Amino acid sequence: KSVTTLKDEEIGFLKGTMKEKMEPFMYSFMHNFEKVIGKYNVELLRANNMIEEMPIAYMRGINIDNSITIIDEAQNISIDNIRTIMTRLGENSKMIFLGDENQIDMKKKGESSLNFIINKFKDFDEVGTVVLGEDDVVRNPLIKKIEQIFRESKM
């Protein structure tokens, strides 16, 4: 998951283990993951060390084999960093990139990797893309109206 914070809202250095440091950044993903597969199943996967959380900075030099890697908030990962992530793909593995092009928090929006990877890899047989639209919003019906206001305001 990208550890990009919202518009200059730095939180400073965090104490603790890598897992403890990653926890605030992983909270939203894990919360939603629990909704999908259930809290018990997430706890079971954690207990069996089948879930690993890793900052991009620690990925260099590793191969990710026999795994499904989920990269959340991909719109806030730079193209250089997405390259680091993608080139870790090992045997019998898949990568899933999640993101919203309307929620880019990077200072230079053109450096976001989400549209880059969608456009550059769309013709690869090994790559699939799912784009969710306004009709796919399930969080709250009001969200559709909120998104429409922001789209019309070009924010």
Which residues fall in each region the model found?
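Conserved helicase motor core of SF1/SF2 NTP-dependent helicases
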Residues: 1-155
